[in-house]
């Protein structure tokens, strides 16, 4: 079994309901179970500011699935909850599920990049992750605690 860390975000169609439904769906993924869930945080949008704030959280999910199998499930959950993928980056969305980490693996395929390509620059991903895995060490040996200390990300407000 591998522990995958998944970032959850929503800023459309009742974000609290979206995230709670996503958590139920993540818990229903075969050969997987949720270990822990962070608090829910309210964060400003990345990119265009003419959209609602996001609800962000992190989940530790233990799974025996392969990384791309897990990705298939997370993308199916997004679609079931009304996610429409548009050319516009950082636009509003009903649900965003990003596989931030998959054990200690480094994955770089056409469909999946793990660790998440920009997570070390995103406080809205790192603070919830720190809440559930404060001693986490990235595959490159960098400690999550040290990243948060040296980059001085603003603390997040709870939802």
From Swiss-Prot:
The keyword ATP-binding applies. PROSITE patterns: HPPK. It catalyses: 6-hydroxymethyl-7,8-dihydropterin + ATP = (7,8-dihydropterin-6-yl)methyl diphosphate + AMP + H(+). CDD domains: HPPK (cd00483). One of its GO terms (biological process) is tetrahydrofolate biosynthetic process. InterPro entries: Hppk (IPR000550), Hppk_sf (IPR035907). Its EC number is 2.7.6.3. Thermostable. Retains 75% of its activity after heating 30 minutes at 96 degrees Celsius. Pathway: Cofactor biosynthesis; tetrahydrofolate biosynthesis; 2-amino-4-hydroxy-6-hydroxymethyl-7,8-dihydropteridine diphosphate from 7,8-dihydroneopterin triphosphate: step 4/4. Keywords: ATP-binding, Folate biosynthesis, Kinase, Nucleotide-binding, Transferase. GO terms for molecular function: 2-amino-4-hydroxy-6-hydroxymethyldihydropteridine diphosphokinase activity; ATP binding; kinase activity; magnesium ion binding. The keyword Transferase applies. It comes from the Bacteria. Catalyzes the transfer of pyrophosphate from adenosine triphosphate (ATP) to 6-hydroxymethyl-7,8-dihydropterin, an enzymatic step in folate biosynthesis pathway. Belongs to the HPPK family. Monomer. This is 2-amino-4-hydroxy-6-hydroxymethyldihydropteridine pyrophosphokinase. It comes from Escherichia coli (strain K12). The gene is folK.
């Amino acid at each position: 079994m591998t522990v995958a860390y998944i970032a959850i975000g929503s800023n459309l169609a009742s974000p609290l309901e979206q995230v709670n439904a996503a958590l139920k769906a993540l818990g229903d993924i075969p050969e997987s179970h949720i270990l822990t869930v962070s608090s829910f945080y309210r964060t400003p949008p990345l990119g265009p500011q003419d959209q609602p704030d996001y609800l962000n959280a992190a989940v530790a999910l233990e799974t025996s699935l392969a990384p791309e199998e897990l990705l298939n499930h997370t993308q199916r959950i997004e679609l079931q909850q009304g996610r429409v993928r548009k050319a516009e980056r950082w636009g509003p969305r009903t649900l965003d599920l990003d596989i931030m980490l998959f054990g200690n693996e480094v994955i770089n395929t056409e469909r999946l990049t793990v660790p998440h390509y920009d997570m070390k620059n995103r406080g809205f991903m790192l603070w919830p992750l720190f809440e559930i895995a404060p001693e986490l060490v990235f595959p490159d040996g960098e400690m999550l605690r040290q990243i948060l200390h040296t980059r001085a990300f603003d603390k997040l407000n709870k939802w």
